[in-house]
């Protein structure tokens, strides 16, 4: 089954066909760094992390770009409130954001472009729009003339006449029409500013993403993502700028995450009903937060309650208990000289669940449905282990392989599998030490020394003592 994604642009699910065979280029709108990351933000980044992981699991090479807006009205306001330098304030919260994402096991983007490091690129982009007749200079900045872009509203469904109705140009604004938006803002006293053809100033919000995504992913790329709240005006304006500049389709698939809700309202800083990732991590493990998010499809609203996240914690513990049951059983499991009905029953459950997992993820990355398949395997494993006196290692390994796929795609159980891998490595090292000891007894020192030297090159140092050979890890 081919991967199908819901495209906000076409309002339907479509077969996923990237522009370049075997490669996916994706851009996710990053944070404006003026405060701590809350669960509403993290929901989006966890969702796109899983989308990226799944695409990579399916064999695609993914080039992922996520920006940082490190100069903006919100940053300037917060800096004025706290008395901090806007640059230092943005740098501080940028670092906090990266720390939070690392804690949540969100894989780093390949490129994290910052607005303040791409000012000249933004100026060049605005000049192109001006040259093509889509932008004009007003007394307080440079504006995009929305009426000149005939496809305006194609993402959000907003009609131009709806924007114009009841709107007006405020006194002192330099725009021609109320719907026009700023590409470049002329400097105000005390604000950060850069030289430009229009005098000192700073970029508008929407132009930043158009510029940086195009710079690193090209004039057309596969996926642009963000939260539902960015569809209008941010993403609508991005399309207008980018397609006005290039003259062709900019992004093939637009993906948007649903809101995190608290008592029926969107979690947001403006309402003050948010919980930061740092607060959550004081009470719950990173995997509990990931699991809580993945219990819902990424486009659906996600209701945040203490009971809900505790329920996620309990469900995750059930799966960890199953993995531990597998580990213990495999230590004493028999080699399979035959399979009986119980082995075939577990095998069939794992096989069918694996198909359900892939079908769910192929269907617009439906993590909620995929998790149902995971619990089917969990329940089947525990039933099997209560039924049989001597479990078979080979059928348990089938279940474990399925859990490894889930781990790779969902970013769960990673510590468990690291421990398993470490245990396997140690067993292999012990085997090589034993083989080397036998070679030394046979006075085959050439081959014994080769094992010692090869292990050292891999970071394992052997020391021969009167009590036998011991080994330890070293840096290489």
Swiss-Prot record:
The keyword NADP does not apply. Binds 1 zinc ion per subunit. It is found in: Cytoplasm. GO terms for molecular function: ATP binding; cysteine-tRNA ligase activity; zinc ion binding. Its main location: cytoplasm. A motif ('HIGH' region) lies at residues 31-41. It comes from the Archaea. A motif ('KMSKS' region) lies at residues 266-270. It catalyses: tRNA(Cys) + L-cysteine + ATP = L-cysteinyl-tRNA(Cys) + AMP + diphosphate. Its EC number is 6.1.1.16. Pfam families: DALR_2, tRNA-synt_1e. ATP binds at residue 269. Its cofactor is Zn(2+). Transmembrane segments: none annotated. Keywords: Aminoacyl-tRNA synthetase, ATP-binding, Cytoplasm, Ligase, Metal-binding, Nucleotide-binding, Protein biosynthesis, Zinc. GO terms for cellular component: cytoplasm. Zn(2+) binds at residues 29, 209, 234, 238. Disulfide bonds: none annotated. SMART domains: DALR_2 (SM00840). InterPro entries: Cys-tRNA-ligase, Cys-tRNA-synt_Ia_DALR, Cys-tRNA/MSH_ligase, Rossmann-like_a/b/a_fold, tRNA-synt_1_cat_dom, tRNAsynth_Ia_anticodon-bd. One of its GO terms (biological process) is cysteinyl-tRNA aminoacylation. Belongs to the class-I aminoacyl-tRNA synthetase family. This is Cysteine--tRNA ligase. It comes from Thermococcus onnurineus (strain NA1). The lineage of its organism: Archaea, Methanobacteriati, Methanobacteriota, Thermococci, Thermococcales.
């Amino acid at each position: 089954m081919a991967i199908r994604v819901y495209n906000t642009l076409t309002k339907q699910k479509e077969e996923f066909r990237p522009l370049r065979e075997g490669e996916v280029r994706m851009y996710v709108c990053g944070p404006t760094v003026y405060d701590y990351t809350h669960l509403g933000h993290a929901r989006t980044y966890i969702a796109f992390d899983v989308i990226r992981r799944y695409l990579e699991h399916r064999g695609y090479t993914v080039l992922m770009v996520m920006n940082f807006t490190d100069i903006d009205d919100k940053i300037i306001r917060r800096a004025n409130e706290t008395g901090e330098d806007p640059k230092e304030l943005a740098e501080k919260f940028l670092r906090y954001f990266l720390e939070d994402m690392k804690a949540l096991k969100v894989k780093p983007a390949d490129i994290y472009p910052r607005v303040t490091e791409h000012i000249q690129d933004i100026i060049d982009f605005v000049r192109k729009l001006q040259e093509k007749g889509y932008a004009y200079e007003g007394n307080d900045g440079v504006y995009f003339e929305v009426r000149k872009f005939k496809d305006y509203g194609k993402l959000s469904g907003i009609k131009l006449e709806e924007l114009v109705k009841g709107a007006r140009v405020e006194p002192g604004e330099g725009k021609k029409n109320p719907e026009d938006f700023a590409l470049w803002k002329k400097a105000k006293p005390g604000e950060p500013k850069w030289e430009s053809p229009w005098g000192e100033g700073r970029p508008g919000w929407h132009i930043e993403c158009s510029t940086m995504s195009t710079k690193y992913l090209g004039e057309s790329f596969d996926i642009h993502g963000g939260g539902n709240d960015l569809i209008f005006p941010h993403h609508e304006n991005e399309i207008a700028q980018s397609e006005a500049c290039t003259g062709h389709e900019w992004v093939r698939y637009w993906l948007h995450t649903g809101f995190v809700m608290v008592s029926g309202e969107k979690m947001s800083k403006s309402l003050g009903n948010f919980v930061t990732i740092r607060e959550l991590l004081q009470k719950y493990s990173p995997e509990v937060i990931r699991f809580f998010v993945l219990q819902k499809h990424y486009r659906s609203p996600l209701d945040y309650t203490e009971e809900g996240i505790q329920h996620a914690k309990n469900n995750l513990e059930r799966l960890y208990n199953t993995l531990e049951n597998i580990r213990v059983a495999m230590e004493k499991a028999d080699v399979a000289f035959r399979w009986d009905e119980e082995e075939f029953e577990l095998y069939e459950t794992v096989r069918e669940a694996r198909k359900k997992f892939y079908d769910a993820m192929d269907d617009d990355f439906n993590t909620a449905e995929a998790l149902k398949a995971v619990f089917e395997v969990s329940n089947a494993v525990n039933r099997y282990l209560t039924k049989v006196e001597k479990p078979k290692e080979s059928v348990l390994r089938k279940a474990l392989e399925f859990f490894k796929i889930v781990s790779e795609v969902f970013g769960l159980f990673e510590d468990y599998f690291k421990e398993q891998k470490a245990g396997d490595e140690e067993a292999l090292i012990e085997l090589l030490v034993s083989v080397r000891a036998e070679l030394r007894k046979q006075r085959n020192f050439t081959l014994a020394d080769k094992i010692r030297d090869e292990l050292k090159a891999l970071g394992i140092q052997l020391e021969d003592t009167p009590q036998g050979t011991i080994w330890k890890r070293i840096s290489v």
